[in-house]
Amino acid sequence: MREEIFGPVVTVYVYEDASFDETLELIDESTEYALTGSIFARDRKALIHATDRLRNAAGNVYYNEKCTGAVVGQQPFGGARASGTNDKAGSVSIFWRFVSARSIKENFVGLEDFSYPSNLV
């Protein structure tokens, strides 16, 4: 697929076992879009290998689940690459997109000990 299409589209690619890594490379490099993806496999090692190899290939990845399987309000959701900024709507991490955090610490007791490390009591 070369375009991002929002609609009921499914792509099924059947590959030979010997072509697994080549297929993962095709998935990872064939499009600039990366909203969601699903991996169906009975072999847990294959799932882990695919996840490691496709780390940046989709904002959300589903194992043995349809790629529209996000649980709204319970599972962070957001696309990567040209499909978004990979901010996860529904997660506290989306908050950091709109703020610049600054930490402030104030001592109300008075500073008497200047030794280091200062975190020891």
Model regions: which residues?
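Conserved C-terminal structural/oligomerization subdomain of aldehyde/semialdehyde dehydrogenase
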Residues: 1-121
